[in-house]
Amino acid sequence: MSALPKSELDRYSPMVEADLSEVVAIEADIYPFPWTRGNFLDSVRAGYSVWVLRDRTGVLIAYSVMTLMIDEAHLLNLSVARHCQREGLGWRTLEWMAEVARGYGARTMLLEVRPSNVSAVRMYERYGFEKIGVRRGYYPAHTEREDAIVMRVAL
């Protein structure tokens, strides 16, 4: 399967409560320690910048969650359905989130990522994110907690 054509990328829309069953199903499929329905619901209700991407048939294939504070965006979650990974949708969703952040006046974007998520780390580095720190024991893991790499990019 090839990446969606650019015309299909116009299907980003704000995440709403009706999307949560699909979002949580993808989250549970791709992560050993997924966000809960409550995490996503709290993000929607708190007014975070939360987005979903649907393909031309209406199937939810990617989503993202970001907070915006004055001139800084904090990307909390960017995920692509397993069957659509490695097609450029993570990159395109990152570009979308950066565009949204710039529209709100953000000059920088921060995120945390697991060191074990090598493909995500590489994507963020290609985009221009730089490693600026480590949060010790940030993520749950099977035996011990996993650190988070803190990254930042100028928008």
Report residues per predicted region.
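Conserved short alpha-helix immediately C-terminal to the canonical SAM/SAH-binding motif I
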Residues: 93, 117-120
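Aromatic-flanked redox-active Cys/Sec active sites in thiol-based oxidoreductases
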Residues: 80, 113-114
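Conserved SAM-binding loop
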Residues: 12, 112-113
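Conserved active-site tyrosine of GNAT-family acetyltransferases
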Residues: 124, 129, 151
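A secondary-structure capping/hinge motif
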Residues: 131-133
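C-terminal "cap" of GNAT-fold acetyltransferases
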Residues: 6-7, 107, 114-118, 137-155
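Acetyl-CoA-dependent GNAT
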Residues: 3-87, 91-100, 104, 137, ...
